[in-house]
């Protein structure tokens, strides 16, 4: 089988980007020749390596841009390196199509440069960039917001077919991107159960507290860590409830600001920010947690997006609390309690409801894990990836 795919991801390296790496290794395991272009970072600094059957090409990037000139420099530099490495990959390995993973919505430009060679563009829609811009800056009338809509339209205009993470994104692909429904495949970012091992809790992590609330994820502007800290303060100030430890696992651009806010709120004795940690330490914390939290605030971006952490909590058999978001509710269903939109006090009350009811926690955790085992795990969701590419290559006579 001579089916060759080049995956381009601009914002994260592989294997750190779990979705992209699962896609790449699944395709390679099913007989495809797979290459990936990505940035250097997160401890992955080799410019080339052949890893688990995948050719990986990496490039350096400037620091994240701020302002129009900063973003132009960041994205322009990325596009140049992607084009340079795509040419190198085409000569050394070859590819029939470029599988572009956003954000940002600009990788179609690289694919256009290879169109005369018969290379098609396949879009992998990870984030809805117009809504992401709105969540960060709130300026839907601005030129930059409109440019995000234009880039998204161009992305769909130039792609042969698309993978999307959920039904909300599929609706956008059809209504905003003009795609035919049969050319849009829902490829959910299901976790691999062999990566997320259930193990015995480590009581020492709780710092002597009776309960632990866990969070896993990026510490960024739109992740809603402020709500989590407000919920922690609400519970701490209730009489007789200074028995909860909060473990916040993950790094990101807002980590230091959130640490400072935590200190100002007087929560240093019950909240720990671990930063980015090795996988085993991550598992230690999540397995020790009694309840896990997805504190992403309600906005147009988060309401339509599937959060990996929700599925990872479920895979580990953890009950969770989150704000009532469309795709969050679809993923978790009865494995979660749902707080009112952006109401930290209601989130705190929902957390207390679970901490006070061990039987309910156990039932919800088992429900969530079974949902991953039987429906939402990568073993099931990856079928859409293989179906989409089989259809594509058969249309090319391969």
How would you label these PLM feature ranges?
Residues 17, 223, 280-284, 294-315, ...:
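Nucleotide-sugar-dependent
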Residues 239, 249, 256-283:
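Nucleotide-activated donor-binding/catalytic signature segment of Leloir-type glycosyltransferases, i.e.
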Residues 336-344, 353-359:
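Conserved acidic donor-binding segment of nucleotide-sugar-dependent glycosyltransferases
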Residues 44, 79-82, 95-118, 122-131:
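An aromatic- and histidine-rich active-site surface loop
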Residues 168, 189-190:
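Carbohydrate-associated surface elements
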Residues 83-87, 106-109, 113-117, 129, ...:
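Membrane-proximal helix-turn-helix segments that form the acceptor-binding/catalytic region
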Residues 6, 163, 206-232, 247:
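Conserved donor-binding/catalytic core segment of Leloir-type glycosyltransferases
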Residues 1-44, 48-56, 189:
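N-terminal subdomain of nucleotide-sugar transferases
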């Amino acid at each position: 089988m001579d089916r060759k795919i080049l995956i381009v991801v601009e914002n994260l390296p592989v294997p750190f980007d779990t979705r992209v790496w699962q896609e790449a290794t699944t395709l390679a395991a099913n007989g495809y020749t797979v290459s990936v272009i990505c940035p250097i970072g997160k401890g992955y600094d080799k410019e080339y390596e052949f890893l688990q059957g995948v050719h990986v090409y990496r490039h350096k990037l400037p620091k994240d841009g701020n302002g129009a000139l900063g973003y132009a420099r960041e994205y322009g530099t990325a596009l140049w390196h992607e084009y340079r490495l795509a040419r190198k990959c085409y000569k050394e390995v070859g590819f029939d199509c470029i599988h572009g993973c956003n954000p940002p919505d600009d990788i179609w430009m690289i694919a256009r440069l290879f169109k005369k060679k018969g290379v098609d563009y396949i879009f992998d829609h990870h984030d809805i960039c117009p809504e992401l811009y709105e969540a960060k800056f709130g300026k839907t009338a601005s030129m930059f917001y409109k440019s995000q809509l234009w880039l998204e339209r161009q992305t769909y205009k130039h792609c042969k077919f698309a993978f999307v993470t959920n039904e909300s994104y599929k609706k956008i692909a059809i209504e905003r991107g003009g795609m035919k429904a049969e050319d849009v495949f829902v490829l959910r970012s299901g976790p691999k159960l062999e990566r997320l091992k259930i193990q015995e809790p480590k009581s020492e992590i709780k710092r002597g507290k009776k309960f632990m609330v866990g969070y896993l994820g990026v510490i960024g502007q739109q992740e809603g860590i402020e709500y989590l800290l407000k919920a922690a303060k609400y519970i701490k100030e209730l009489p007789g409830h200074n028995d909860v430890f909060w473990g916040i696992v993950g790094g990101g651009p807002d980590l230091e600001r959130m640490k400072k806010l935590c200190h100002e709120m007087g929560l240093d004795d019950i909240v720990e920010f671990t930063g980015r940690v090795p996988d085993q330490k991550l598992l230690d914390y999540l397995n020790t947690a009694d309840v896990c939290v997805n504190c992403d605030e309600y906005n147009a971006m988060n309401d339509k997006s599937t959060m990996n952490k929700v599925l990872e909590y479920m895979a580990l058999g953890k009950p969770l609390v989150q704000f009532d978001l469309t795709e969050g509710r679809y993923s978790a269903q009865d494995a979660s309690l749902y707080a009112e939109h952006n109401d930290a006090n209601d989130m705190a009350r929902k957390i207390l409801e679970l901490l006070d009811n061990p039987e309910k926690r156990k039932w919800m955790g088992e429900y969530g894990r079974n949902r991953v085992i039987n429906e939402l795990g990568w073993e099931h969701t990856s079928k859409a990836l293989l179906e989409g590419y089989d259809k594509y290559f058969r249309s090319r006579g391969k």
